C-alpha cells in the first residue's frame, strides 16, 4: 500500500509543505495498517492518534480518508473505508477495564496526602467526597474499622492492615477530619490536585478517582463478591451501575 502514496500525492495540487505533511502522515498510517485494510486496523490507528491535538488529529484523519478513497477509486480496495471520530468511542465501549498492579501506590513518597487519598479509594472504594468527609472520631484503628456517615446512610468498612500505618501518620494533630486545616475540611480542588500530583509521580498520569474506584470494583468482583454485596459496600441505592462489570 505504501507504493501508492506518491501517485496519490501527485494526483493532488499540493504545495511542497503540504506534500511533506501528507507523505509523513501516510507513511505512519501505512506502517500501522500494513497491506490489508480492515475495521480493526483502522480502529487501532484511530486510537493511536486519539491523544493528539484536535487540529493534528483532524489533519491526519482527513489525509487518511482521502487516501482510502483514492485506493477505492483505483480498485486497490474492494470496499470503501472511512475513519470517523466515533470509531474510538465504539472501541472503548467494548473494551473491558483491566486490573492494574498497585504495588507502587504503597511505596514511600513525598506526596503523602495524595497517596492516602488514592489508597482510601483503592482499598475501600470511596468517592472523593466520602474521603473528604472522614472524621477522626469515626476511625477506629485498634479494631481496624471506619464508620462512614453520609447522606445515604451509615456504612461500617473494615480497614486492611496495610492501610493502618498510612492512616496513623495522617491522624497526628487532626481535630475533626482526616484531611483538614484547623478543623476545616479541604476543598474539592485540593483533593483533586493532590491526587493528580501523586498518581503522576508514580507514572499513572490520567488515572482519576473514578478509575481508581473502578479498580476496587474489579478486585472485589474477582474476590467473589456478588453484585448485591458490592453495591452495599459502595453504598449504592441500586446495583444497576455495576451490571456492566458482571456481564459475561
From Swiss-Prot:
Cellular component terms per the entry's GO annotation: cytoplasm
Subcellular localization: Cytoplasm
Gene Ontology MF: a single term: tyrosine-based site-specific recombinase activity
Disulfide bond positions: none
Sequence ranges assigned to domain Core-binding (CB) in this UniProt record: 1-72
Active-site positions on this chain: 149, 213, 245
Keywords from the named record: Cytoplasm, DNA integration, DNA recombination, DNA-binding
Residue ranges constituting the Tyr recombinase domain according to the UniProt record: 85-248
InterPro entries linked to this entry: CB (IPR044068), DNA_brk_join_enz (IPR011010), Integrase-like_cat_sf (IPR013762), Integrase_catalytic (IPR002104), Integrase_recombinase_N (IPR010998), Tyrosine_recombinase_XerD-like (IPR020876)
GO biological process, alphabetically ordered: DNA transposition
Function according to Swiss-Prot or TrEMBL: Putative tyrosine recombinase. Not involved in the cutting and rejoining of the recombining DNA molecules on dif(SL) site.
This protein's name: Tyrosine recombinase XerD-like
Amino acid at each position: 500500500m505504501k507504493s501508492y502514496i506518491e501517485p496519490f500525492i501527485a494526483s493532488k495540487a499540493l504545495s511542497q509543505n503540504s506534500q511533506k505533511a501528507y507523505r509523513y502522515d501516510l507513511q505512519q498510517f501505512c506502517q500501522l495498517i500494513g497491506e490489508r485494510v480492515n475495521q480493526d486496523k483502522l480502529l487501532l490507528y484511530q486510537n493511536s492518534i486519539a491523544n493528539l491535538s484536535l487540529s493534528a488529529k483532524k489533519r491526519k484523519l482527513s489525509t487518511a480518508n482521502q487516501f482510502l478513497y483514492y485506493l477505492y477509486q483505483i480498485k486497490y480496495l474492494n470496499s470503501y473505508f472511512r475513519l470517523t471520530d466515533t470509531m474510538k468511542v465504539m472501541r472503548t465501549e467494548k473494551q473491558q477495564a483491566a486490573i492494574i498492579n498497585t504495588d507502587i501506590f504503597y511505596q514511600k513518597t513525598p506526596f503523602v496526602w495524595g497517596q492516602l487519598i488514592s489508597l482510601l479509594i483503592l482499598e475501600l472504594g470511596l468517592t472523593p467526597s466520602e474521603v473528604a468527609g472522614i472524621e477522626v472520631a469515626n476511625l477506629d484503628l485498634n479494631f481496624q474499622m471506619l464508620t462512614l456517615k453520609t447522606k445515604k446512610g451509615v456504612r461500617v468498612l473494615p480497614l486492611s492492615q496495610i492501610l493502618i500505618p498510612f492512616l496513623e501518620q495522617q491522624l497526628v494533630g487532626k481535630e475533626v477530619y482526616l484531611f483538614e486545616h484547623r478543623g476545616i475540611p479541604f476543598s474539592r480542588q485540593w483533593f483533586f490536585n493532590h491526587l493528580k500530583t501523586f498518581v503522576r509521580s508514580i507514572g499513572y498520569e490520567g488515572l482519576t478517582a473514578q478509575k481508581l474506584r473502578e479498580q476496587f470494583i474489579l478486585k472485589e468482583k474477582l474476590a467473589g463478591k456478588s453484585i448485591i454485596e458490592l453495591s452495599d459496600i459502595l453504598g449504592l441505592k441500586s446495583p444497576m451501575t455495576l451490571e456492566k462489570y458482571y456481564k459475561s
